[in-house]
Amino acid sequence: MATEKRKETEIARSVLEKLLDLMEIKANVVPVEEAPPDESPDEEAPLGNAADTTSVISFDVQGDDLGILIGRRGQTLASLQYIVRLIVGHQAQVWLPIVLDIEGYKKRHNESLQALAWRMAEQVKAQRMPFALEPMPAFDRRIVHLTLANHPDVTTQSSGEGESRRVVIIPKEQFR
C-alpha cells in the first residue's frame, strides 16, 4: 500500500511539475505528509472510481511571485488542482484525492475564514439577528460551517443558488 501511494504521489508530482513547466513557472513542488484537516478531498470523483480517500496526496508549490497560480480568491489554484486531479486520475485509472497549496495560501485563507466566522458569530450573538456572509465557494462555506459547528449560541446554514450561495449565521435562540 505504501509503495502504491509513493507511485501515485510521483505521478501527481510529475504531472504538476510538467504543467508548471508548460506555463513557464519556476517553482518547487514539495510533497506534504498529510492534507490540511479542513480540506475536502472527497469531492465528487470525476472518474466515478474513488481511491482510498484517507490517503490524500498533498503538495505545496514554493517559489517567487506565485500569486498568478493562486488567482482571484484562489480560483486559479482550485482550477489547477482540478486539472491535476483529472490528468492523474486518467493516468492512474482511479480518482485520487489531490490537494495543492501555493506557499501556504490555503492555510492562511482558512485561518482568515475561521476568524471571520468567529467575529460574525459574536456579532450575531450580541445583536440576536441573523447575518449573511458574502457568497463563497463550497470549500469556503464548509470551513465556516465546521468552525461554528459547536458554537453554543449560533448555528449556520447555506442559502442561495450557484455562485450566489452563502452562509447565514443564525442565533440558536431563533430555533427554540
Positions of the model-derived regions?
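RNA-contacting regions in translation and RNA-metabolism proteins
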Residues: M1-R176
